[in-house]
């Protein structure tokens, strides 16, 4: 996600504007707004720190790779939280980039099961894609012959806003 925070010459950066707008909008929906970041785990963010999500430093971890929360995207974690707290409205901003192992077998089920349950509970799920400038690395791109590589030439890339909750809060 860090690549969305850095300007790309000649490209419009929408990420910062959208994050600012989402913060204002979310404070008008429901009684209380909670912010979290997620990678391999979900961590709370204080309301006065949310603006840091628009800066590259927010995504940097100075710990060992094993201790860093930015080494994978566990998108099923906020989905499980949304399933557990049925009265809340969840707004998730993600690049929707999943590793190939997350898209097969039981791991795929851990992603789809909470979504199916949310829909069965008559909640709505809205997804909006936003094409924005991108200036960073895209990791774990699968190779045809196996393995992965890092792509560094992207100038634009979409990010996604996933909204889960009552339909009246999503429209």
Residue ranges of each PLM-predicted region?
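Von Willebrand factor
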Residues: 1-94, 98-99, 125-133
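Extracytoplasmic/secreted cell-surface and envelope-processing proteins
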Residues: 2-8, 43-48, 99-108, 135-140, ...
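Well-ordered, non-membrane alpha-helical segments in soluble/globular domains
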Residues: 8-22, 57, 61-79, 103-117
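Sec-exported extracytoplasmic/periplasmic mature domains
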Residues: 23-30, 83-84, 98, 120
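VWA/integrin I-like adhesion module and closely mimicked acidic/polar interface patches used
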Residues: 97-162
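Long, low-hydrophobicity ectodomains and other hydrophilic envelope-associated domains
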Residues: 159, 168-171
